[in-house]
Amino acid sequence: VTEVMSNDRLPCTVIHNDEIIYYGCSVRLKSSQRGRSNESRVGFNIKFPSDNKFLGAHKTIAVDRSSQREIMIKHVVTRSGKIPGMYDDLAWVIQPRSNRATSGILMKSRYDDEWLENAIEDGEDGRMFEFELIYHPNNTNGGREGLKLPQPDGVVGVQMRNQGGDDKELYRWHWLIKNNRDADDYSGLINLLNTMGLSGQDYRDSIEEVVDVDQWLRSFAVQNLGGIGDNYATHGSGAWHNAIFYIRPTDGRAMYFPWDMDFTFTNGATSGVTPSTDLNKLIGIGPKYERAYYGHLLDIIETAFNAEYMGPWLRHYSDFLPSENLNGYSGYIRSRSNHVRNLIGNAVSKVSFRVTSKSGNDTDKSTIPVRGDAWVDVREIRLAGTDKGLDVRWVDDNSWEVNLPVKSGPNEYTLQGIGFGGEIIGSVKYSVTGNGSIDSAGPENLAISEIHYHPNPPSDEEVSLGFTDSSMFEWIELVNMSDSRTVDLSNVRFVNGIDFTIPSGTLLGPGKRIVIPANVAAFKQRYGNLNNGSLLNHSFLDSDGNNKLSNSGERIVLYSAANITISDFSYEDDRPWPVSADTGGYSLTLMMPGNNDPSEA
């Protein structure tokens, strides 16, 4: 057989459930050259007419007949959540040859545009690459000029590193571009590989800008739990393939999608969970990510990868796949999950959620550092009554520190350790008395007082100075509602409408106002000096002109440094909100700041 690697399609008809007939389809082989030359493994890729998609939704589907026990780890991926997983099922496939009626994994939608646009914001605009080996044939059917035979073959692999420059031709064959092929854009991938090759402080300073580290850790965790063989996630060297890397369009950071897990449950039940050199570099950044990785392992075990949960599903799948003997893997799952629990306990000592700092002290500061302990089952730390975690500094694998806001007089706090599923792991009290002259910002002393969301277009003079878009002249004003106390605005941040954090050390005097400009230079050019209030010397518009206010209205949310809601309201560009604020040169002034009522604007 010499033509097995052809991707030419042949016309076909598909009958689904002996009822629905799809005419005008086309089919090609699917698999590596090792699978395509093996009739028991070869799969199929089927394309449907644009006006008659499979189940009304899928332009193409694939049938994977190789190692169908992979359905178990795919089930774990879906059950665990927050791990990219495809729309897979099991199917009985009747091929043209009468002796080739077999089961297979039905891949209704792989990581294609259909999946991306439903799973990720602007997902179809990202760039996706399949990390693979190069397989080259070693023989022909008749000398040098003969046709190449798929077997035997040789294999060439490379690490996830820069291959000698920025020429995309160096990367094309090991990182197969899977979408937006016309753009042929390898820049995000090359940036990822450059960063992966850094070391020491350079690596630690750069990796979070290029990689969604926590997402990678969860993908690594599920594949190491599943004992996947022949896979990027589970080998220190030699398995430089079977992974998908996706460059997210919203922030340019890379995501890691599990891919081609045929060899599920291949590695021993007592094998380790940190075999990969790239994984070890990530968790070596610091205790934040080491504990996060072990926390992901624990969460996946408790959510899905345990014999109690998977047992009924193994019996269910075994009814359809009797030759796979899936029931026999219940013992593997039990042994594997117990072993990994022990590895987690050995890596990070188990402690109860608690505060170790002394409670009841006095302070003249507007914030106070508080320390405590937490095990890997704690995903974040919150103040009771809030829905966002505090900014936590992990001192070591199970010791944390947070800064709490302090106001004049007694301050009582309830700190909660929150698990991966949002459950409360533990809750502790802490108190401090404030006796300083500066209060931390909160809803009782700070408010949004004015918004200029749709300025007039730039004048010719402004355009000549580089201020080419009206959004550059947007601004938001905050007011200190206290007539006697200074407010500390450090790390107060907008989390909806715009994404912006006020720099540390920013203070606002009693009754004073501060303007946060979209662009500092543009603001000064158009509005000059402020007579009443101060101008923050930081812009919220980013260098690409994004992160701006909506001209048609949106929700604005302002949080304190402790993630307490200061302001949360929505404005519109139509009545009953004042329409003069919509490109009429006027701003939207809130007569009762923080009140989501257009009659008060």
Where are these regions (language model features)?
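Conserved NTP-binding catalytic cores of kinases and kinase-like/nucleotidyltransferase enzymes
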Residues: V1-M72
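Middle-to-C-terminal accessory/interaction subdomains
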Residues: E3-V4, E19-C25, Q33-G35, E39-S40, ...
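Internal "kinase-insert"/substrate-recognition segments embedded within catalytic cores
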Residues: G43-K53, H58-T60, R65-Q68, K82-M86, ...
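Short, solvent-exposed loop/edge segments of extracellular or virion-exposed proteins
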Residues: R354-T363, S449-E461
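Long, low-complexity serine/threonine/glycine- and acidic-rich segments characteristic of extracellular
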Residues: K365-T367, R371-N435
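Solvent-exposed beta-edge/loop recognition patches
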Residues: F420, I438-A441, N456-E474, G497-P598
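Asparagine-centered strand-capping/turn motif at beta-strand->loop junctions
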Residues: L478-D483
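Short, hydrophobic/aromatic beta-strand segments
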Residues: S484-R493
